[in-house]
């Protein structure tokens, strides 16, 4: 089993030293879903929400969140992301919105946390914008879909 890299020999939280690593291209994709009533989803899809374009706002929030992951998660490194993409898809057959994020850089550490943060914050933003009409929306299935680059190699979720 692989060791926990953020815990030092004394069992204390520790930021990993990546200074000796080579720069490589790293990429990660993540997803999240938010479920809601059909009426709430229809309001989003029709553009009739009084707060404006829900998807555009969630997309920008996800991008901003990816860039600030290091400020939210204590042991994440500040990263110079070269690409952040957040795509939102309405799924009327299941009354959900699927959010998929992509983060990319050339650097010494991976971008999994940035991709997960982007998808999560985009979902939270949808919740925030729609909570006035529905409070029981459910954010679910936040997960890493794929990562490549770095010493741990290529990962694809089952």
UniProtKB/Swiss-Prot annotation:
<comment type="pathway">
    <text>Cofactor biosynthesis; molybdopterin biosynthesis.</text>
</comment>
<dbReference type="GO" id="GO:0006777">
    <property type="term" value="P:Mo-molybdopterin cofactor biosynthetic process"/>
</dbReference>
<comment type="subunit">
    <text>Homohexamer; trimer of dimers.</text>
</comment>
<dbReference type="GO" id="GO:0061798">
    <property type="term" value="F:GTP 3',8'-cyclase activity"/>
</dbReference>
<feature type="active site">
    <location>
        <position position="128"/>
    </location>
</feature>
<feature type="binding site">
    <location>
        <begin position="75"/>
        <end position="77"/>
    </location>
    <ligand>
        <name>substrate</name>
    </ligand>
</feature>
<dbReference type="Pfam" id="PF01967">
    <property type="entry name" value="MoaC"/>
</dbReference>
<dbReference type="InterPro" id="IPR023045">
    <property type="entry name" value="MoaC"/>
</dbReference>
<keyword id="KW-0501">Molybdenum cofactor biosynthesis</keyword>
<dbReference type="InterPro" id="IPR036522">
    <property type="entry name" value="MoaC_sf"/>
</dbReference>
<feature type="binding site">
    <location>
        <begin position="113"/>
        <end position="114"/>
    </location>
    <ligand>
        <name>substrate</name>
    </ligand>
</feature>
<comment type="similarity">
    <text>Belongs to the MoaC family.</text>
</comment>
<comment type="function">
    <text>Catalyzes the conversion of (8S)-3',8-cyclo-7,8-dihydroguanosine 5'-triphosphate to cyclic pyranopterin monophosphate (cPMP).</text>
</comment>
<dbReference type="GO" id="GO:0061799">
    <property type="term" value="F:cyclic pyranopterin monophosphate synthase activity"/>
</dbReference>
<dbReference type="InterPro" id="IPR050105">
    <property type="entry name" value="MoCo_biosynth_MoaA/MoaC"/>
</dbReference>
<protein>
    <recommendedName>
        <fullName>Cyclic pyranopterin monophosphate synthase</fullName>
        <ecNumber>4.6.1.17</ecNumber>
    </recommendedName>
</protein>
<dbReference type="InterPro" id="IPR047594">
    <property type="entry name" value="MoaC_bact/euk"/>
</dbReference>
<keyword id="KW-0456">Lyase</keyword>
<dbReference type="InterPro" id="IPR002820">
    <property type="entry name" value="Mopterin_CF_biosynth-C_dom"/>
</dbReference>
């Amino acid at each position: 089993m692989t060791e926990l890299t953020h815990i030092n020999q004394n069992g204390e939280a520790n930021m990993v030293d990546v200074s000796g690593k080579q720069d490589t291209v790293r990429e990660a994709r993540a997803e999240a879903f938010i479920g809601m009533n059909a009426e709430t989803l229809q309001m989003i899809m029709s553009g009739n929400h009084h707060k404006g374009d829900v998807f555009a706002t969630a997309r920008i929030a996800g991008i901003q969140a990816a860039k600030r992951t290091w400020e939210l998660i204590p042991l994440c490194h500040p990263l110079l992301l070269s690409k952040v993409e957040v795509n939102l898809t309405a799924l009327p057959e299941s009354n959900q919105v699927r959010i998929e994020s992509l983060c990319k850089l050339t650097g010494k550490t991976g971008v999994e946390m940035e991709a997960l943060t982007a998808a999560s914050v985009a979902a939270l933003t949808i919740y925030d914008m729609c909570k006035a009409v529905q409070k029981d929306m459910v954010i679910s299935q936040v997960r890493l879909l794929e990562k490549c680059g770095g010493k741990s190699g290529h990962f694809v979720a089952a």
